Swiss-Prot record:
<feature type="binding site">
    <location>
        <position position="61"/>
    </location>
    <ligand>
        <name>Zn(2+) 1</name>
    </ligand>
</feature>
<keyword id="KW-0560">Oxidoreductase</keyword>
<dbReference type="InterPro" id="IPR023921">
    <property type="entry name" value="ADH_Zn_actinomycetes"/>
</dbReference>
<comment type="function">
    <text>Catalytically different from common alcohol dehydrogenases. Effective in oxidizing ethanol, other primary alcohols and benzylalcohol only in the presence of p-nitroso-N,N-dimethylaniline (NDMA) as an electron acceptor. NADH acts as a cofactor here instead as a coenzyme.</text>
</comment>
<dbReference type="GO" id="GO:0046294">
    <property type="term" value="P:formaldehyde catabolic process"/>
</dbReference>
<dbReference type="Pfam" id="PF00107">
    <property type="entry name" value="ADH_zinc_N"/>
</dbReference>
<dbReference type="InterPro" id="IPR011032">
    <property type="entry name" value="GroES-like_sf"/>
</dbReference>
<keyword id="KW-0862">Zinc</keyword>
<keyword id="KW-0479">Metal-binding</keyword>
<protein>
    <recommendedName>
        <fullName>NDMA-dependent alcohol dehydrogenase</fullName>
        <ecNumber>1.1.99.36</ecNumber>
    </recommendedName>
</protein>
<dbReference type="GO" id="GO:0005829">
    <property type="term" value="C:cytosol"/>
</dbReference>
<dbReference type="GO" id="GO:0051903">
    <property type="term" value="F:S-(hydroxymethyl)glutathione dehydrogenase [NAD(P)+] activity"/>
</dbReference>
<dbReference type="InterPro" id="IPR020843">
    <property type="entry name" value="PKS_ER"/>
</dbReference>
<feature type="binding site">
    <location>
        <position position="167"/>
    </location>
    <ligand>
        <name>Zn(2+) 1</name>
    </ligand>
</feature>
<dbReference type="InterPro" id="IPR013149">
    <property type="entry name" value="ADH-like_C"/>
</dbReference>
<dbReference type="GO" id="GO:0008270">
    <property type="term" value="F:zinc ion binding"/>
</dbReference>
<keyword id="KW-0520">NAD</keyword>
C-alpha cells in the first residue's frame, strides 16, 4: 500500500514529504492509521546530529490512531481499537520489564535503527528501506508497527488530545512524581518549559509541592507554567536560585528537574547548586551522548548527600501510565487541551519545528488527513 510521510535523509536537512510503499503486518505486528502526531524535540536531535539514526528515516515518535489490521499472533489489540503509541516498546519478558522497569525494555535498544525488532523494514521506496523513528514513524499517514508499541485507550477520547500522552506528558509528569519523588510540601525547580517541562510542572503541582519554580527565558512559557501549577516563574537560573533561598530560608530545593531541549553543562551545574542537602537533580533532557555535560564536585555530592540521576520516560511504565494519565485528564487533574499551541498539517512539519526552535509553541500537533 502507499502512504505519505515526512522523511529525513541526513542530519542538517529539513523533512521531505514523500510517498512510500508500506508493507502489511507480519507476526506480532499491527497496521495503524495515525490520526495525530506530536512535534517533540527529540526528532530535532536527529536533524541537529545529537542522535545519529540510520537514514533515511520517517520522523515522529509520538502518535495516536486507529488499528486497521493485525498480523498473526496479535493479542493486545484488534481492528478498530483506538491506541496511543509508546516510543519505547514493552516486550513484558526481558529483565527490565520483568523487574518493573519497562521504560528500559531491551526492545528499545534499536529504536534509532528504525527497523522492526528482527531488523527488517516496513517502509520502502525505489528499492531503499526506510526506517521509522522509534519503530513508529508517526509522521506517516499509516505505519506497520509492533503490538508492543501500542496502548489501547478509550475510544471516546479525542485522539488529537490523547496523542500528547505518548511521550511529553508522561515524561515530564513522571520526572517529578517517579524519578524526582516529589512529595507534598517540597520545593521543586523545573528548568525548561517545553513539552516535557510544562508537564513536570503539572506533575510537581499534582504531587503537592509547596513551591514549583519554573525557569525559562520565553515569557509566554513562563505564563503557561503559572497557569498550569507553577507558583513562581523566572527567566534565569540566578533569579530562581535567589527565590528558592528566600522561600526555604536557605534550605534550598528538594528537586531540580532538567527538561531543557538540549542539556548543557551550565544547566546541570545550576540545578546541582539549587538543591539542598539530600536533594535530587533529575536529567530528563537529551544531549549528544559523546559530549560531557556533567562536571560537579564529588565532595559536595558526598557531604550533602546530593543525587544526580538520569531518567528515560520519567521512569514511568508506558502500559500503565499512559492510561493513568488519560484518566487523570478526564478527572480534571491533568491538563492536556491547554498544552497545544498550534496544529499543523503533515506538509507543515518543518514550519512546526521552526516554531518550536523559535520558542513559539509549547506543544505542536500534526493532524493527518481523514482519508
Amino acid at each position: 500500500m502507499k502512504t505519505k510521510a515526512a522523511v529525513l535523509h541526513s542530519a542538517g536537512k529539513p523533512f521531505e514529504i514523500e510517498e512510500l510503499e508500506l508493507d502489511g503486518p507480519r507476526e506480532g505486528e499491527v497496521l495503524i492509521k495515525y490520526t495525530a502526531a506530536g512535534l517533540c524535540h527529540s526528532d530535532l536531535h536527529l536533524i541537529d546530529n545529537d542522535l545519529v539514526p540510520r537514514f533515511p528515516i520517517v520522523g515522529g515518535h509520538e502518535g495516536a490512531g486507529v488499528i486497521e489490521d493485525v498480523g498473526p499472533g496479535v493479542t493486545k489489540v484488534k481492528p478498530g481499537d483506538h491506541v496511543v503509541c509508546s516510543f519505547i516498546p514493552n516486550c513484558g519478558t526481558c529483565r527490565y520489564c520483568a523487574t518493573g522497569r519497562s521504560n528500559l525494555c531491551d526492545m528499545g535498544a534499536t529504536i534509532l535503527d528504525g527497523g522492526m525488532p528482527d531488523g527488517s523494514f516496513r517502509f520502502h521506496r525505489g528499492g531503499t528501506d526506510y526506517g521509522a523513528m522509534c519503530m513508529l514513524g508517526t509522521f506517516s499517514e499509516r505505519a506497520t508497527i509492533s503490538q508492543h508499541s501500542v496502548v489501547k485507550v478509550d475510544d471516546w477520547l479525542p485522539l488529537e488530545t490523547a496523542v500528547l500522552v505518548g511521550c511529553g506528558v508522561p515524561t515530564g509528569w513522571a520526572s517529578a512524581n517517579y524519578a524526582g519523588g516529589v512529595r507534598a510540601g517540597d520545593t521543586c525547580v523545573v528548568y525548561g518549559i517545553g513539552g516535557i517541562g510544562i508537564n513536570a510542572v503539572q506533575g510537581a503541582a499534582h504531587a503537592g509541592a509547596a513551591n514549583v519554580i519554573a525557569v525559562d527565558p520565553v515569557a509566554f512559557k513562563r505564563e503557561k507554567a503559572l497557569e498550569l501549577g507553577a507558583t513562581h516563574a523566572f527567566a534565569s537560573a540566578d533569579e530562581a536560585a535567589a527565590k528558592v533561598a528566600e522561600l526555604t530560608w536557605g534550605q534550598m530545593a528538594d528537586q531540580a528537574l532538567i527538561t531543557v531541549g538540549t542539556v548543557v553543562e551550565q544547566v546541570v551545574t545550576d540545578a546541582f547548586n539549587v538543591i539542598g542537602k539530600g536533594g535530587t537533580v533529575v536529567i530528563t533532557g537529551l544531549a549528544n551522548p559523546e559530549k560531557l555535560t556533567v562536571h560537579l564536585s564529588g565532595g559536595v555530592m558526598t557531604l550533602f548527600e546530593k543525587t544526580v540521576k538520569g531518567t528515560l520516560f520519567g521512569s514511568a511504565n508506558p502500559q500503565y501510565d499512559i492510561v493513568r494519565l488519560l484518566r487523570l485528564y478526564q478527572a480534571g487533574h491533568v491538563k492536556l487541551d491547554e498544552l497545544v499551541t498550534k496544529r499543523y498539517s503533515l506538509e507543515e512539519v518543518n514550519e512546526g519545528y521552526q516554531d518550536l526552535r523559535d520558542g513559539k509553541n509549547i506543544r505542536g500537533v500534526i493532524m493527518h488527513s481523514a482519508d
